[in-house]
């Protein structure tokens, strides 16, 4: 599979994986939405109950931080591969895949650290990791500092999992059963919507 990232074969592979996952999804058990059969209200479409969660200061601060952390993400997603190539990293797609591997590792670490650190400290570690990561990318353009680029890539797991995944868990806890779907949608709007504009 290595080496196809520079060809159109990567899209063929993605299409085949998508078809396989679509076929697999047909074998999953029927799970209707919790609100199935209930009337749709206009306030539900506007996520009015979720916006009420912004009244407590702690959730408002989290939402603002999530939005601000997402501002450079659009640039990261669009330009990191070309930036790494220009900085002299060989086989960029393989190098960047180590970021996803670290994400899997840290996803497994979250439950172990959740009890010890709690939500607040895990979010703080995640935010600090974003800062450190971008600093590594800024400082790693020289030949001597190239290892910082690789460390920045490996920090992807801490950055994403400790902030976004823990943030979604936190949102789920704060929102409660009734509005957790709206609350998750609102956070996605703040991060991948407003933040990445």
Where are these regions (language model features)?
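Helix-to-loop junctions at the C-terminal end of transmembrane segments
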Residues: 2, 105-119
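Loop-to-transmembrane helix entry
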Residues: 8-12, 85-104, 147-148, 185-186
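C-terminal membrane-cytosol helix-exit motif in multi-pass small-molecule transporters
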Residues: 16-35
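Juxtamembrane intracellular "pre-TM" segments in multi-pass secondary transporters
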Residues: 30-63
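Helix-loop boundary and gating motifs at the non-cytosolic
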Residues: 58-66, 70-95, 164
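Loop-to-transmembrane helix entry/capping segments in MFS-fold secondary transporters
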Residues: 90, 175-188
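C-terminal ends and interior cores of transmembrane alpha-helices
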Residues: 128-143
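Intracellular juxtamembrane helix-capping segments at the cytosolic ends
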Residues: 162-176
